[in-house]
Amino acid sequence: MPVMRLFPCFLQLLAGLALPAVPPQQWALSAGNGSSEVEVVPFQEVWGRSYCRALERLVDVVSEYPSEVEHMFSPSCVSLLRCTGCCGDENLHCVPVETANVTMQLLKIRSGDRPSYVELTFSQHVRCECRHSPGRQSPDMPGDFRADAPSFLPPRRSLPMLFRMEWGCALTGSQSAVWPSSPVPEEIPRMHPGRNGKKQQRKPLREKMKPERCGDAVPRR
């Protein structure tokens, strides 16, 4: 009976000897794959991949041909080159400056009729650039600013304009201040509740402005 107990062990030994030997190079490769180190993509490569350029994008056929919405196409979307990506300035947008037409053959399916092949022309973006969007530039105030917006609103992320709204002056490179050209209301009383619950009259806006906090005030004529 001891022979019967050793027989399964003998079979396992034979199976282990029949397996191919693993070279030490594969051991090192397996150990390297199991490490926790992650490759870091350098900044230049990240910037190049994310910058404004024409990339392949899937576009719905119906979005390019709205009049064909009652029909079905196969495939329902096509691969086109479209401008996408980031710009170095938040006021700039990735827009196409050169386009080209491409004609594709699709299967058009009509209700009640047999499917038929049709040729549709699509526009592809060839060259892209970062430019200002039309209708968002203002000759008086730089930055991301709409032309139809009120003139007293500061542009986004414009620190000098925030100083102008708060203190009545705008900081410049020479640390001087310039009074705003828009008229400042002086005789418009506004009532607001005081600490004791009674309404109190606010001081004129010009009295709150302290140009000495921004430097030597230079009145604008």
From Swiss-Prot:
GO CC, any one term: membrane
Family membership: Belongs to the PDGF/VEGF growth factor family.
Maturation and modification: N-glycosylated.
Annotated SUPFAM superfamilies: Cystine-knot cytokines
Localization per record: Secreted
A Pfam family of this chain: PDGF
Subunit structure: Antiparallel homodimer; disulfide-linked. Also found as heterodimer with VEGFA/VEGF. Isoform PlGF-3 is found both as homodimer and as monomer.
Annotated Basic and acidic residues bias: 204-221
Function, as annotated: Growth factor active in angiogenesis and endothelial cell growth, stimulating their proliferation and migration. It binds to the receptor FLT1/VEGFR-1. Isoform PlGF-2 binds NRP1/neuropilin-1 and NRP2/neuropilin-2 in a heparin-dependent manner. Also promotes cell tumor growth.
Record GO biological process: cell differentiation; cell-cell signaling; induction of positive chemotaxis; positive regulation of cell division; positive regulation of cell population proliferation; positive regulation of mast cell chemotaxis; response to hypoxia; signal transduction
Region (Heparin-binding): 193-213
GO MF entries: chemoattractant activity; growth factor activity; heparin binding; vascular endothelial growth factor receptor binding
Signal peptide, first to last residue: 1-18
Residue pairs linked by disulfide bridges in the UniProt entry: C52-C94, C83-C128, C87-C130
Comp. bias intervals (Basic residues): 192-203
Main location as per UniProt: secreted
Top-rank lineage group of the source organism: Eukaryota
Tissue: While the three isoforms are present in most placental tissues, PlGF-2 is specific to early (8 week) placenta and only PlGF-1 is found in the colon and mammary carcinomas.
Protein's organism: Homo sapiens (Human)
Residues the record marks as carrying a glycan: N33, N101
Positions of the UniProt region annotated as Disordered: 175-221
The protein's name in its UniProt record: Placenta growth factor
